[in-house]
């Protein structure tokens, strides 16, 4: 895309800054189409911006960040229709945030492919076979969750790739499945992925616990969860009908402080509130 082309040119020319003009006021704390109270994030690190983009934030084409990151060139993301409004600066050493997280992003349509079996415990090379098989088929995996017992590995893919992924994995492990050592690959659709991102995740204990406590109090079950290798993101898979609710309760918890919005319905036969 044009963002990526601009990034390559900026890196080649050693530009002082890369400006990307889009239709929103930079990166937001959440999707403003879903969360009306979402607001602009003033600064992000390269890693934080990459995580948000990888999990659904469509402000910047994800590969755009790497060429300028290597040359330590800041990125300014501005709104073409609001040039004097708030914007986001992406740089290596972003100013520390006073909040526990920087932002929340989501992938609306997710399928979960699960490879499981007792024979996976302690066996070297099973995951290598899984990822090699999927890579050779051109199937991208954007989240991985493995059980502590090593008996199952769940992979988040696009719904369009889900059935094909199951078929080729069943073919790869056909011998183990025939022997009863592994189960046929399982596939679940109708899911969504949510990611909570911020460098403060690695510095503040209890943030992940708070996240799942909020989800639990609101009756939102989690199907799979993964902690990013850089310890600045937590991603999890939920039922798609619960996505909007999950985004709202998490945004309220982490960004709105003690402020709480209530939906109030009043009815009456006459002038409501007259007495």
Q: Where do the language-model regions lie?
A:
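Glycine-rich adenosine-cofactor-binding loop
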Residues: 262-275
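C-terminal catalytic "cap/lid" subdomain
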Residues: 1-260
């Amino acid at each position: 895309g044009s963002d990526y082309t601009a990034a390559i040119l900026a890196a080649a020319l050693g530009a002082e800054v890369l400006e990307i003009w889009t239709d929103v006021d930079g990166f937001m704390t959440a999707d403003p189409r879903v969360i009306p109270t979402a607001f602009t994030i003033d600064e992000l690190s390269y890693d934080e911006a990459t995580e948000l983009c990888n999990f659904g934030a469509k402000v910047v084409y994800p590969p755009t960040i790497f060429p300028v990151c290597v040359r330590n060139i800041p990125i300014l993301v501005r709104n073409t229709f609001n040039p004097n409004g708030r914007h986001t600066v992406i740089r290596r050493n972003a100013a520390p945030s006073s909040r526990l997280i920087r932002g929340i992003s989501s992938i609306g349509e997710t399928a979960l492919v699960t490879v499981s079996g007792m024979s996976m415990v302690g066996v070297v090379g099973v995951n290598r076979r899984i990822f090699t098989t999927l890579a050779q088929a051109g199937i991208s995996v954007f989240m991985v969750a493995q059980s502590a017992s090593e008996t199952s590995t769940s992979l988040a893919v696009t719904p369009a790739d889900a059935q094909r992924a199951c078929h080729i994995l069943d073919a790869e492990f056909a011998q183990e499945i025939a022997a009863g050592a592994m189960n046929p690959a399982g596939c679940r659709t109708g899911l969504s992925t949510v990611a909570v991102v911020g460098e403060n995740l690695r510095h503040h204990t209890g943030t992940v616990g708070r996240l799942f406590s909020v989800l639990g109090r609101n009756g939102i079950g989690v199907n799979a969860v993964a902690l990013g290798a850089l310890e600045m993101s937590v991603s999890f898979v939920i039922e798609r009908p619960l996505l909007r609710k999950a985004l709202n309760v998490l945004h309220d918890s982490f960004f709105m402080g003690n402020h709480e919005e209530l939906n109030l319905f009043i009815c009456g036969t006459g002038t409501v509130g007259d007495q």
